[in-house]
């Protein structure tokens, strides 16, 4: 085995040096890529933590809102129950007052004729009974008697008295 010629050794050394440079360059690029990947992984991990924390906070906020809405619903349902009870009570009162209202309406409709009747009765009361000297001979002792003709055994007739009590 003979020694290789010096040119071949120089070329081989140059080639080895180029391979070493390329290997060092690739290792540096690999290191840079690994650093970049680690940095991205850390950023993604932080971002995931932030998103997870935000999601947890949203869940808690949703739960608080649901609890508040449930409380509001219970309060509203209690108010509805109370109002329904008040309506039932008022309906019952209206049912009790309705016949009286109808009676009052009937009285109001009949008031003018009753007022006329009361005025006539007051006039009759003002006139009073006839004096005994003005009576017709052979007639009853009092011209205004309470006799209906059905009281055959009754010898005594009661005089009519006009009153305005209603």
Curated annotation (Swiss-Prot):
TM stretches of this protein: none
Annotated segments matching region Disordered: 129-166
Any one annotated GO CC term: type III intermediate filament
Entry keyword Signal: no
Protein's cellular compartments: Cytoplasm
Record keywords, A-Z: Coiled coil, Cytoplasm
Coiled coil: 7-89
Name of this chain's protein: Vimentin-type intermediate filament-associated coiled-coil protein
Organism: Bos taurus (Bovine)
């Amino acid at each position: 085995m003979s020694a290789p010629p010096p040119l071949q050794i120089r070329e081989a050394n140059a080639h080895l040096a180029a391979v070493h440079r390329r290997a060092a360059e690739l290792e540096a690029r690999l290191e840079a890529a690994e650093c970049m990947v680690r940095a991205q992984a850390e950023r993604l991990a932080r971002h995931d933590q932030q998103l997870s924390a935000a999601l947890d906070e949203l869940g808690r906020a949703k739960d608080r809102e649901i609890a508040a809405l449930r409380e509001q619903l219970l309060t509203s349902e209690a108010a509805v129950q109370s109002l329904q009870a008040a309506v039932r009570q008022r309906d019952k009162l209206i049912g009790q007052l309705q016949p009286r209202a109808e009676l009052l309406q009937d009285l109001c409709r009949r008031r003018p004729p009753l007022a006329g009747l009361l005025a006539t009765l007051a006039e009759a009361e003002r006139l009073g009974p006839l004096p005994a000297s003005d009576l017709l001979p052979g007639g009853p002792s009092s011209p205004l008697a309470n006799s209906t003709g059905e009281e055959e055994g009754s010898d005594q007739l009661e005089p009519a008295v006009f009153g305005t009590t209603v």
